[in-house]
A protein has these predicted regions:
Chain A
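Conserved "HGTGT" condensation-loop signature of ketosynthase/thiolase-family condensing enzymes
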Residues: 1-175
């Protein structure tokens, strides 16, 4: 069996929930989406200023990994359904791809977007998927994200890793 | 060195029942499977219609009382393994698309569902779980194909399973996305929205070398695939279908197929005003003047929308179209939308299909395309 080629970890970030976590318009009920977005901003820079994803476009993919995703919004949607009155905004807020759509829009990323559920280490799994996506030439850069919510909101966190195909000898000489 | 990827077996489930015969009889005759939902209360919703299987008529092998998503995936997986004649399931990784639910209604996490399916079938590793909404099963198939093409494995089981449940139904109802008239009419001027449907399919994807070594017969070749994002809006598709166009264009280019070689497209076609218009516009951008030659149908008009599993169900429908040289119609299409005209299949048509696309899109601007070629 084949061993997949190596990739280069360009930069990483980890952000935690708390009073300083910026809100994300449209995602007001849970820290899940704000954590994912803040991790991206911490990792690659603010979308409105100079950032590492500028000009990447369709060469950039996003993979989000989590065990249970946005359990806060999901549980809220259950409460709404049980009450017989569901807020329409929950329709998209419970979907894991929604925040990725916002990240893709703000950073102009038009490549593949995936969400993967895990039982173990989400970061390891996301990076393994990134390795395969890069090997398949589905993208040249991958933004790998993980989000972990916790019953204690202060323990919730997100990670972001920007990876790319490992530069060959010629690329290394130039840099 | 990259391997060619083939489909050597599949298992399928829909509101029409288990197996390809039931699916073919229903979808390819254009018979909608919608009926009144009885598994939970829908009296307060815009519609009570969904394509749910008649519980008394369907009993998959070794299913317990009440059909569950896991049982659907297991039954489809077993069908696929048997059809392919694959001997040792322990050699097969699995990639499953499934739903994400609150722990209070679904104690088992999505990846634990995959583990249970894999354990029951005796499958190997890796075991992966995609949950990117309506593109999840297409993504699962694409990921499985990537594993085979990269040489990570000789074969893999990939697909998805979904049963209409109270949570999904109520969320779609709250967004006024369900068709109040109880009809899912893709690309029709009078379309009112989507209807949900039970569905599942598992495909055994296998390298050409493995198929030759086993002296097995491939069903179709998975020629190429592509995923894109609209980079436009969290919940709405790009009005001109930019992401759809990019996915179709990339899938064709990667396979070396030109638009004039494409015969059939199984569209995402949810019957919602925004989605169908965007998809039709995207097809025009990608196919140009060849758009009027390519047959298009929206088979959710008969099966309903199986959400996370829809890409696998529709890949199998596309495969059946190629194998039978019969195109499934879009049911209920009476007044086609004229803004971006397509060559609709309104009645079953006998056509040779050397190349066909299956398309899906989801919330967050995600688009996925897989291109099947005759084996």
């Amino acid at each position: 069996m084949t061993t997949l080629p190596a990739f280069e970890l360009v930069t990483s970030a980890e952000v935690h929930a708390g009073p300083e976590l910026p809100q994300l318009p449209g995602f007001m009920v849970s820290d899940f989406a704000p954590l994912a977005y803040a991790a991206v901003r911490e990792c690659v820079g603010d979308a409105r200023s100079g950032h590492l994803l500028k000009g990447i476009g369709d060469r950039g993919g996003i993979i989000l990994g989590s065990q249970r995703f946005d359990t806060v919004t999901l549980e809220l949607s259950v409460e709404h359904v049980n009450r017989g009155r569901v807020s329409p905004i929950l329709f998209y807020q419970v979907v894991p791809t929604a925040v990725l759509g916002q990240i893709a829009r703000d950073y102009r990323l038009t490549g593949p977007v995936s969400c993967v559920a895990v039982t173990g280490d989400a970061r390891d799994e996301v990076l393994e998927l990134a390795r395969l996506l890069l090997a398949d030439q589905g993208a040249e850069w991958v933004l790998g994200l993980t989000v972990k919510l916790d019953p204690d909101p202060a323990k919730a966190f997100a990670t972001a890793d920007l990876v790319r195909i490992a530069p060959g000898p010629a690329d290394r000489k130039e840099s | 060195m990259t391997a060619k990827v083939y489909v050597s077996g599949f298992g399928v489930f829909s509101a029409f029942g288990f197996g390809p015969e039931a699916l073919f009889d229903g979808v390819f005759s254009g018979s909608p499977a919608f009926r009144m939902v009885t598994r939970f209360d829908v009296s307060h919703c815009r519609t009570g219609q969904a394509a749910t299987y008649p519980e008394a008529a369907v009993s998959p092998p070794d299913a317990g009382p009440g059909l569950e998503t896991v049982e659907v995936a297991i039954a489809c997986g077993r069908q696929a393994i048997e059809m392919a004649g694959w001997r040792d399931p322990a050699e097969l990784p699995v990639v499953l698309a499934t739903k994400v639910r609150a722990p209070s209604v679904e104690p088992e996490s999505p990846a634990e569902i995959t583990e249970r399916v894999a354990d029951r079938l005796g499958l190997g590793r890796p075991r992966r779980t995609f949950v990117n909404a309506c593109c999840a099963a297409t993504n699962a198939i694409i990921h499985g194909a990537q594993l085979v093409r990269a040489g990570v494995t000789d074969a893999v089981l990939a697909g998805g399973a979904f049963l209409v449940d109270r949570q999904a139904f109520n969320l779609f109802d709250s967004a006024q996305a369900l068709a109040a008239d109880g009809q899912l009419r893709p690309f029709d001027q009078d379309r009112q929205g989507v209807l949900l449907g039970d569905g599942g399919a598992m495909l055994l994807l296998e390298s050409g070398e493995s198929i030759r070594a086993r002296a097995a017969q491939p069903l179709v070749r998975l020629a190429s695939w592509a995923m894109t994002n609209d980079a436009f809006h969290v919940a709405q598709p790009h009005a001109q279908g930019a992401g759809v166009a990019a996915a179709v264009t990339a899938a064709l280019q990667r396979s070396g197929i030109s638009p004039d070689q494409l015969t059939y497209i199984n569209a995402h076609a949810t019957g919602t005003p925004l989605n169908d218009a965007a998809e039709a516009a995207g097809l025009h951008t990608a196919l140009g003047r060849h758009t009027e030659q390519v047959f298009v149908s929206g088979t959710k008009s008969t099966t309903g929308h199986a959400l996370e599993a829809s890409g696998a169900l529709e890949a199998v429908i596309t495969l059946l179209a190629m194998r039978s040289s019969t195109l499934p119609p879009t049911a209920g299409l009476r007044r086609p939308d004229t803004r971006h005209p397509l060559r609709h299949v309104s009645v079953p048509e006998r056509v040779e299909v050397p190349y066909a696309l299956s398309l899906n899109s989801s919330v967050g601007g995600v688009n996925a395309a897989i291109l099947l070629a005759a084996a």
